[in-house]
């Protein structure tokens, strides 16, 4: 349980500070009962660290001190973001009980958001008129807006269950999606996205689309495989996969975006995305078409068809086309390179193959392998009449 004191807050920071987010006002404390008195221990700034995890992605990491069984932990922070078009969902529940949680958002009048609340637990909500300064370029505009306050008190733990696809789908939470911007004297600009637009966004992303265009970083070493002597595509795929897995070990983390392949190969370890992008480049170099099939992991919630959202995507597997009419799947989180053998967390009912020239498509990964589970129950019943 003490692992809850190790907190990671992801945020964005584009190169050259073109657009960025700042985490400010961070404050964290631990409360312990000692000799009948509540003792508060505040976190010091020297345990707060920043970590770059991609060209545009950062993590703020900190550890709350003096945490043990029975400790109450508390932390708060504020996000200042240039990415007004993307506000992260706020989850009021966790897999441990929440004594109190609060979320505040102030929205200028020109921004039109779709606000969705769902979950079984009740949140106290307050909507108030607000007056604020809005920075637009070098201009400071005084405008009105709406301040939204959401509070949760004594929320129960939301435990995972083997019979539930994803407990997070039932979590009490608030989702905000920007629908459009309506400035005076300007045309209304819609921000509602389609899946085709999300395809394009990913293909242009430096930590995703650029990885699909990279040259095979193991091109010279791969000649030792003598792929030209192998008969079928399946044999080549398995040989390439085994060769790569001997170079890079999976670090047990799933991701959507990747680090530099040079860095991954140097460290000898990486996320499934780090390794999968290298695998795609190697397969393409061998003349075997391969694409990322993006998804939301089963433990992260169902990917919605009707509400396209890039925030719902969190990883991908490799979709391989050994022939024009077939697709097989691989993921670097699997130790042995068996085709169509995926861990249960990746066997989702919907994934989207990202391909150039508007050739993206939806696929289901629920039944990619011929898996059958049988349970036999024997019981002896005694009847007393």
Where are these regions (language model features)?
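Lumenal/extracellular ectodomains and adaptor appendage modules
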Residues: 1-105, 370-385
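Second-shell loop/turn segments in exported
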Residues: 14, 59-63, 222-230, 262-269
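Hydrophobic/aromatic-rich core segments of domains that either
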Residues: 274-357, 362
């Amino acid at each position: 349980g003490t692992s809850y004191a190790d907190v990671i807050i992801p945020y964005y920071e584009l190169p050259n500070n073109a657009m960025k987010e700042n985490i400010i006002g961070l404050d964290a404390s631990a409360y312990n009962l000692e000799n009948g008195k509540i003792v508060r221990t505040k976190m010091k700034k020297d345990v707060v660290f920043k970590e770059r995890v991609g060209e545009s992605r950062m993590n703020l990491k900190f550890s709350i001190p003096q945490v043990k069984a029975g400790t109450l932990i508390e932390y708060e922070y504020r996000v200042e973001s240039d990415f007004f078009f993307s506000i992260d969902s706020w989850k009021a529940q966790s897999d441990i009980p929440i004594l109190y949680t609060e979320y505040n958002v102030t929205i200028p009048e020109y921004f039109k958001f779709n606000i969705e609340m769902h979950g079984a637990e009740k949140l106290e909500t307050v909507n108030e008129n607000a007056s604020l300064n809005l920075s637009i370029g070098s201009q400071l505009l005084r405008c009105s807006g709406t301040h939204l306050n959401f509070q949760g008190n004594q929320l129960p733990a939301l435990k995972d269950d083997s019979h539930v696809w994803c407990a997070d789908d039932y979590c009490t939470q608030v989702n905000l999606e920007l629908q459009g911007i309506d400035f005076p004297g300007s045309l209304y600009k819609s921000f509602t996205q389609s899946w085709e637009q999300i395809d394009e966004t990913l293909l242009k992303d430096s930590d995703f689309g650029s990885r699909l265009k990279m040259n095979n970083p193991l091109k010279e070493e791969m000649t030792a495989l003598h792929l030209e002597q192998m008969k079928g595509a399946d044999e080549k795929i398995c040989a390439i996969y085994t060769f790569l897995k001997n170079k890079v070990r999976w670090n047990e983390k799933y991701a959507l975006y990747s680090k530099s392949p040079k860095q991954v190969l140097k460290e000898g370890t990486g996320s499934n995305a780090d390794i999968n992008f290298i695998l795609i480049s190697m397969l393409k170099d061998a003349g075997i078409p391969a694409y990322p099939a993006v998804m939301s992991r089963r433990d992260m919630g169902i990917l919605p068809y009707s509400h396209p959202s890039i925030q719902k995507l969190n990883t991908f597997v490799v979709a391989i086309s050994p022939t024009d009419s077939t697709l097989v799947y691989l993921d670097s989180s699997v130790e042995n390179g068996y085709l169509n053998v995926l861990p249960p967390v990746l066997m989702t009912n919907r994934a989207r193959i990202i391909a150039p020239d508007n050739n993206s498509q939806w696929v289901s990964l629920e039944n990619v392998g011929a898996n059958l589970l049988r349970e036999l129950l024997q019981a002896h019943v005694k009847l007393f009449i």
